[in-house]
Amino acid sequence: MAQNWTAWIAGAMRMDEATWARHANPWSAWTRLPILPAIVVVLLLRDTLGVATWVLLMLPIIWVWLNPRAFPPPATLDAWVSRAVMGDKLWVERDRRPIPQAHAAMAQGLSLLQAPALVPLVWGIWAKDAPLALTATALVIAIKFWFLDRMVWLYDTRAATEDDAR
């Protein structure tokens, strides 16, 4: 099976076991939330910011890479967002460790659902229409949270199955 795009991204980010463990820290997951809004706001203000736009765009982009490495692993994986991260890891590794079809179908569907929301987001940025761009950003984030909730379900399902097998 061809490598999935999420696995390619994780590979480019050098997401090894230690990095995933650190990324499961709730501080890591929650401090990623403002990345997309920050990028959108900087792009909306590009005329006002001028050359500083490029510097301000680089900060959240650098944070995307640094973030999973910036915090220690959590003491437990009990937090909702920690389980979401570990479910996301299972999703990324689905070519090597198959996941139940129902989880795969829902995750793929939610990923596809984000695509139409990107159209008004990109248009809003291009047209400097802040209400449109920010509404679309909120929609993309809402769909991402739905996806993360499904990743929690995937992680909990896998954890229960593996616990039952012991």
Spans of features found by a protein language model:
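A cytosolic-side transmembrane-helix exit/cap motif
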Residues: A70-A84, M151-D164
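Short, charged cytosolic
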Residues: M1-A12, L77-V92
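Hydrophobic alpha-helical membrane-embedded segments
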Residues: L33, L43-A75, I143-F145
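Core segments of transmembrane alpha-helices
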Residues: T31-V40, H103-V122
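Short membrane-interface loop/juxtamembrane segments of multi-pass integral membrane proteins
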Residues: V81-G109
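Helix-coil boundary and interhelical linker segments in multi-pass alpha-helical membrane proteins
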Residues: V41-V55, V122-L134
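Alpha-helical membrane-embedded segments
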Residues: L134-L148
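Cytosolic-side membrane-entry/anchor segment at the start of a transmembrane helix
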Residues: M1-L36, F147-R166
